[in-house]
Amino acid sequence: MLVEYLFMAHPEDGADTISHWKMDIDGTEITDARAGFGSYRDTYFRYAFTIQCNAATESIANGQLAGWTTAKTINITARSYSTSYDQDVHATRYWDGTSATHFHRPSLFLTALS
């Protein structure tokens, strides 16, 4: 299954950003899904990871499930590298000739792969 999370972000202080993103299934982190993003201006990001649902051996840290027959909770979380690189997520900083911040709705796509 392909998990894709698309979102807008911009530097909180107007300079640049560094952020770290991770995903977990039922509270266990998929360490192979760790990612970092950075930008200097409004940027549209794509955080994505493919979960293998028919693995011979289950290893959530590697994104491998032996099967998927019950409900599962997938969490995507993020943090700034430090307060010097804060990121305002789900927003634009610049719009129509001004620097007013506007909300931008994120998108989540779950695609079954065969």
Each predicted region: which residue ranges?
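Extracellular jelly-roll beta-sandwich "head" domains, especially the C-terminal globular C1q domain
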Residues: M1-S114
